[in-house]
Structure formats: C-alpha cells, structure tokens
Amino acid sequence: CSHYGRTPPCVDALVAAAPARVVIAMGDPNPQVNGQGLARLRAAGIAVTAGVLLDDALALNIGFIARMHRGTPWMWLKMASSLDGRSALPNGVSQWITGPDARADGHHWRARSCAVLTGIGTVLADDPQMNVRAVSTPRQPRKILLVSRFEVPLDARLLDGAPTWIFTAREDAAKAAVLADRGIVVTCLPDAAGKVDLTAMMQWLGRHEINEVHAEAGEKLNGSLLRTGCVDELLLYLAPMLLGEGAAMAKLPVLTQLDQAQRYRYTDVRQLGDDLRVRAQVEARWQSLRKAVEVAA
C-alpha cells in the first residue's frame, strides 16, 4: 500500500525498517496504488520477490480484486439439488434436500460474503431470515432483496437484523418511506422489461464497496443472474437422491448447440456428510483477475 486510506501507507514503514528482501503474493490492482509501492521499495534498494502463492492470494482476495479490476463484486450462486438437478418437489417442498453438514457449510459462505442476495419469490414462499446462524461470525452480512413490483411484506423476517438494501423496478414512495424509517435503503433500477436491471445493480454494488455477493434464490432469479453474466462461481450442494419432477436449480433458455453453453472449471469437490459440494468458476473471469494482479506485481 502506498496511499493514505484508513491508515498511512505501509510502504513507509517497510522502507524505514530497511529489510533486505520483501516477498509478496500479488500486486494491488487499486488504481491508487498499481505498483507504486513496489517501485518505492525497489528504489530504496530493497529486493522484491513477487508472485509467491499467487493463486492462493487471489482466492483469498477475489472479491476485492474483482471490484478493483472491473468495478463489480464477485458473485457466487449457491444452489442445492438432488442428483437429477431438482431443487424442490412439484408442490414446492424443499426442506431439507441436503443434510446439516451441507447447510452449515452454506452458512459459512454466507458469513464470508459482504452481502447475501435473494428474490421476492423466496421471501414469499419461505420467509427466510437470510442471515448466518449455523456458524459463528463476528458480523452479519448485509441483505439484498430483489423485487420488481415492490410487493414487499413489511413483516418479512429478512427485513430484520442486518442492514438491508432493496432493489426494485417500480416506485412506491409510501412503502419506501416506511422502510427508510427502519434504515432500509430502496433503489429503483428498472430495465426495459420492467424487471430489476441486474447489470446496473452489480455496478451499484461495486460503487458501494461490496466485494463478494452470496446469491441464494429460486429458479427464476437464479436463471436471470446466470443469463446476465452476474455469476462468477457456482456453489452446488448435491444430495444423494432422485426427485423426478420438480423445480429446477435455474430457469435457463433452451440451447440448440453445445458451444452455446457457459463453461466452468471445477475448483473443488468434497463430501459434506452424505452430500457433495461442488465449486466451479467461469474460467475466463478467474484468468482475467489473475492477469490483473500479475501485471500489477
């Protein structure tokens, strides 16, 4: 760091300490820094070795790197399903497809995020709290609710607890005023179809310093997030059962050729109790961020 933020530049302390060598994992893509700290170290005669454990450092800081490099947070989409890709029975019953270990792991990922995002369909169907309960955490992530027509129940449990942002496509000044009195921020971002503009929302979140978003919704919103390119990573929990007919994980358009499919790379597969957790990232997104920190280093 070579600029004044919440604290003075740490490069000043390093130069004053005069070590023979400094080892770093990656550069800082923040335009206020962008290699200036490394240049100052080298100008002071300090040897610098960069790129050590680069991939580990990128994984640890991926949300910040994404926001600095492209202006939007890193989003992972959490979905739980049967082996045949069903997230609920035809009557809507989904509790619980996965076991307690998988559900606790999902709360770990909520805790890691800056914000937990869901849609009004999930709120109306399940009235979830969307907070962290199954693991300990020093703070609750912010909550984000997407609701096109502003049909927000004022007694929804999601509105309690951690700070909440609501994105809508339709103004309702009276309801917005009631929510504002509870500290809830409402932002209207309509697209041409009368839905919430998801691309504009991601840019808005980036401007408000949200690094990582944990999305956990129903098949319609999941599909919309995937179709618009908001999702960088999939967090899939697979239960060892077959459900047959029922809700899909995501509502996606019909493809006619295999080369139209979005490709992912597996980054981790592990067993949690009786279930499997699969992590998969959009390869091009990861490589773009990796290149950004390599260049900065």
Predicted regions span which residues?
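Short, surface-exposed acidic/glycine-rich loop or hinge patches that mediate macromolecular interfaces
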Residues: 1, 27-28, 192, 241
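Zn2+-dependent cytidine deaminase-like catalytic core
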Residues: 2-56, 142, 160, 165, ...
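Enzymes that bind and transform nitrogen-containing heteroaromatic metabolites
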Residues: 6, 39, 74-297
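Short secondary-structure boundary segments
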Residues: 4, 18-19, 66-72, 184-187
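Proteins enriched for Cys/Gly/acidic motifs involved in redox and nucleic-acid/cofactor modification
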Residues: 38, 52-82
